Amino acid sequence: MKRTMKKLFVFLAAGLLAVSCIINIGNGFVSVGNCTEEGIDYTEVREVGAFNAISHSLPCKVYFSQADQQEVRVESTEEFAAKVITVVEDGTLKLKMEEGRYPKLILRVVITSPDIESLQTHGCGDIIHKGTLRVKGDLTVKTSGSGDIRMGMIEAKAFTAQSRGSGDIRIEGVSSANFSASVSGSGDLNFVRVDCAGFKVSTTGSGDISLSNLTAKGNAEARSSGSGDIRLSEITVDGDMELRTTGSGDITVNGTCHDVMASTTGSGDISGNLSFGHIDARSSGSGRVRL
């Protein structure tokens, strides 16, 4: 019996190593062992309708950049390119594979557009952007699978970042009127610099939120109700700050603000080196407020 169970464990472990990504496409599944960009020898420009959002469900990297003209370019082999579905529905460019098993997939997708409102990845594929993206209206970036989103500088009226799975989001800089970021899974959010009016971050999962530099002309809010931590390294907030922990996650804040309302009802601490005018500190759990 022990030998049989050991063989079964080895078999299952080998199977997990052989399949790095499984994507539910609604009426079936896409199973991918390994996706690489090595061996690309075929390029196909897709004719698609106008879009202002991208929904990425491919198991590969999608490279997005801002340009005067809209273009969707599939770079692969001729065989694999034929399996890639690119369709626009209600202004959203949807990227997905035909149902099947792909032990080795050679693929990447390059997209340009003059403007964009939403970038979302739903599977194991990443979205990569470099440089500066100037959006006319609001921008939402979201990952709900294991895929990551990595972006450069962003200028928008309002900016929203959401991580609902294990995927991470890393952004070099954001300049917007309103800034909102939330985590409800195990993925981490990392921002190097944020310049905004209103600022709000929250985590309800195990993922962390980190921000190196913040300048907020209005009020700022940080809430942790899971096990994830929130770290705000260097902040300048002209308005008030509201800091709340109701779980085991900690909030660390360094910088200056007007007044502070800090409350912990769980085991998480609120700490840091923060200069302020007045503080209303409350603690009803094992967590402490030390600012």
Predicted regions, residues:
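Intrinsically disordered, low-complexity terminal regions
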Residues: 2-291
